[in-house]
Amino acid sequence: MIEQLAQPMAGDGCRAELFGEQHRDGLRAACAEDRNIWAIYANNFGPDGFDDSIALYRSSPRNRTFVLFEGHELAGMSSYLTIDEGRHCLEIGGTYYRPHLRGSGFNRRIKNMMIERAFDSGIRRIEFRVDVRNARSQAAMKKLGAVREGVLRADRITWNGHVRDTALFSILKDEWPV
């Protein structure tokens, strides 16, 4: 299951490749384009935290981080997180897009591709965990057809010390496509 999830993906003008060292500088530069956004993320992929955060994501054998492309342009990143082969569940998260791609439909195309791959690989439940302060991401989850299951109060302490409430969304295999 995990091996299939880690394969490159492509479709609808976009693609996703598993993060490798050849992507480090380009992804770091893309993540630096919106330094203020990292305040509402659990981890800091801005210039002063990028290397530590990418190392943290890559350190878990249950995570797979992808570099995203719009055509030939490096567009951002997203990950399969906490892949649980026993429960057939995972989270899609750690998603960041360069500012000029937000609201362009890129998110929908990438998420469709990642969701389809997950379900085709045997996953039955996909979760999305969003800081309650992140209205844009919550709206995007609703557009995808994800069900808002509730709020995990004081769920985690983010990189900047904020005690975060997390909105939990999910999509089940038998609910997809919406």
Language model segments and positions:
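A conserved beta-strand-loop-helix scaffold within acyl/acetyltransferase catalytic domains
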Residues: 31, 35-87, 95
